[in-house]
A protein has these predicted regions:
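Extracytosolic ligand-binding ectodomains
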Residues: 2-6, 10-11, 25-364
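Sec/Tat signal peptide C-region and signal peptidase I cleavage site
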Residues: 19-25
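Bacterial N-terminal signal peptides
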Residues: 9-19
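Long, low-complexity, tandem-repeat intrinsically disordered regions
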Residues: 1-2, 17
Length: 364
């Protein structure tokens, strides 16, 4: 299934007789633009590994266009400013055909505007979830394999309502991701009959959020909803909120999920903390992926790792379908391999997919 900006669902879903010397297949460069440093650095390694796992499977099953995938990793630091030069290196210096990434929405848009779109390069983010990506003027080059926060915000609001929460204090990181998610959450929570007693934005990367916490605590709500990053604002705000003792229950979103969130915090002080993230895959493809990841020593439930695998596999399928490592035509090829109708390709079924593509059979 393919919905532009864009959601690519889990799809994973010629020889020429000549007397001349044989033409050797060339390797294909595909980038992974990950936020390896910055506020989601604790989330990044499994996401990179998920994309690399897809490439490793392609290489083990005959390769791409007869050659091998060579992956090149860049660091966009979850920062639109840093993402530009990092993407420029992949696009113009390394000359990748396409790339997976970035991971944060701001970095994804920054990479696209600075290098991806001007370079006619397809990119698929496994985790950029802000609604702002949907309206990006991208020449049909920017895609994602995770749902928009237009969906996550609704689910977060519904979760709180189901738990009997009627009022919250909300703080969100002041960027496309944070504001987009907060806006959707507030609208749905209020539609459910809830009250947002305080709605305070914050800047990421600060050492002290006590002023913001003072505003939030002043609302009188005992429930704090935190939209931020595990290795950045979310950890610091949570730690200082626990120290202040003004809140009894904490809620978060996908960005707060990470090993760094509870560093130095007594788990007993945040007992009952709940967070939303992209739902677990279900069905036959999900079970196949779980086995593939487990056999490779990876955690199949790691946040956005399945979506990264999906992104990497889809790019490889699109390049094979396109018939060359050229950037031209790749976006259209991606839509062909990721959309119905067609024979379903499960995770790991690279050799099968190549046979079908060569036979002119539609795949999905």
């Amino acid at each position: 299934m393919l919905v532009n900006k864009k959601l690519l669902g889990l799809a994973v879903a010629a020889s020429v007789l000549s007397l001349a010397a044989p033409v050797l297949a060339e390797d294909v460069k595909i980038g992974i633009l990950g936020d390896l440093t910055g506020p989601i650095e604790s989330l990044a390694p499994p996401i990179v590994a998920g994309a690399q796992l897809a490439f490793d499977q392609v290489n083990a099953q005959g390769g791409l266009l007869g050659g091998q995938i060579v992956s090149i990793v860049g660091d966009s630091a979850c920062d639109p400013t840093a993402a530009g030069p990092a993407a420029d290196k992949l696009v113009n210096t390394d000359q990748v055909t396409a790339f997976v990434g970035a991971f944060c929405t701001g970095a994804t848009i920054g990479a696209a505007n600075a290098a991806g779109i001007p370079g006619n390069v397809v990119q698929i983010s496994p985790s950029a979830s802000a609604p702002a990506l949907t309206t990006l003027e991208d020449n049909d080059l920017v895609f994602r394999t995770t749902p928009s926060d237009a969906f996550q915000g609704v689910k977060l609001a519904d979760l709180l309502t189901q738990k009997g929460v009627t009022d919250v204090a909300l703080t969100y990181v002041n960027n496309d991701y944070g504001k987009g998610l907060a806006d959707v959450f507030v609208k749905q929570f209020e539609a459910n009959g809830g009250t947002v007693s305080a709605n305070v934005s914050h800047e990421d990367g600060k050492a002290d959020y006590r002023a913001e916490l003072g505003q939030l605590a002043g609302s009188g709500s005992q429930n704090l909803v935190l939209i931020g990053y595990a290795s950045g604002s979310a950890h610091t705000i949570l730690q200082q909120a626990v120290e202040g003792g003004d809140f009894a229950v904490f809620f978060g979103v996908d960005g707060v999920i990470g090993d760094d969130l509870l560093a130095g915090i007594d788990p007993a002080k945040v007992e009952g903390l709940s967070a939303t993230r992209a739902g677990a895959y279900t069905g036959e493809s999900a079970e196949i992926y779980k086995k593939i990841a487990t056999d490779a020593g990876q955690d199949p439930a790691a946040t956005y790792a399945p979506q990264a695998y999906d992104a990497g596999f889809l790019l490889a399928l699109a390049i094979e379908k396109n018939g060359s490592a050229s950037r031209d035509g790749l976006s259209a090829a991606l839509r062909e391999v990721a959309s119905a109708p067609g024979e379903i390709i499960r995770p790991g079924e690279w050799a099968k997919a190549v046979e079908l593509i060569k036979a002119g059979t539609d795949i999905d």
